[in-house]
Regions:
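A detector for small-residue-rich transmembrane helices and their helix-helix packing motifs
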Residues: 1-234
Length: 234
């Protein structure tokens, strides 16, 4: 289901969220498209680098950052940026600009590390040489924080061709379960091409990280939705 809006107004202009979206498009338009596969080889993250530096275009400690701004095609970047545009602004409101920026990168790192661990433990040597790229792990962390902060927010989405409105906990909870079970299926059926090329456990890891961090900070009173935002989903 494609999300259309969440109905919660931003407290202030989401500077960091817009900057992240702009940076992703800039990298895609001015680095990836002109350079093609060479760009992917140069700036993606390879799980095998953590183990034995099998690719080494960049040190893996740098590549996990550059990989967050790389995408496999127009559908990949448009889908990711749509989710970030809809859900990221309200999470930025709660975390603050600097906190949101740190959270985004930390979520991306957590997502990449879980996917890498799963690949190295259960995958083949060939799997470990497949480039990991995309902002979806960091965005999954944003979704995990959102479901904790705004569980009853109404998400307008397309069901086939019909717009419907459902609670965020249903929409994002369903999204998470889909990622988890598709990832589990991929582990149990490695020769099957269903979901091939999708780093499902990066999505799972990012989402869990985001939800845990948001829950801890919310309980500690370090972050909170504004009164206007609370009123939007009562």
């Amino acid at each position: 289901m494609i999300p259309l809006s969440d109905g919660i107004p931003s407290r202030r202009f989401p500077v960091v969220n817009i900057a992240l979206i702009a940076a992703n498009f800039a990298v895609f338009l001015f680095f990836e498209l002109p350079n093609g596969e060479a760009a992917v080889n140069q700036a993606s993250f390879y799980p095998c680098d953590v183990d034995n530096a099998c690719h080494s275009a960049l040190p893996w400690g740098v590549a996990w950052i550059t990989a967050m701004f790389m995408h496999a095609g127009w559908d990949h970047i448009l889908g990711n940026m749509l989710f970030l545009a809809i859900f990221g602004n309200n999470v930025e409101d709660a975390f603050g600009r600097l906190g949101y920026l740190v959270f985004d990168f930390a979520g991306g790192f957590a997502a990449m590390m879980l996917q890498t661990g799963i690949t190295l433990l259960f995958g083949t040597a060939a799997d470990a040489q497949i480039p990991n790229l995309g902002a979806s792990g960091a965005i999954a962390a944003v979704l995990g924080a959102y479901i904790v902060l705004y569980p009853k927010s109404r998400i307008r989405t397309l069901l086939v061709w019909f717009p419907i409105s459902i609670p965020a906990w249903v929409y994002l909870g369903g999204w998470f379960l889909y990622q988890f079970f598709e990832g589990k299926y991929a582990l149990l059926h490695p020769s099957n091409e269903r979901g091939s090329g999708v780093a499902f456990f990066a999505h799972v890891g990012g989402f869990i990280f985001g939800a845990i961090v948001a829950r801890i900070l919310l309980a500690a009173g370090r972050i909170t939705p504004t009164e206007t935002q609370r009123a939007a989903y009562r």
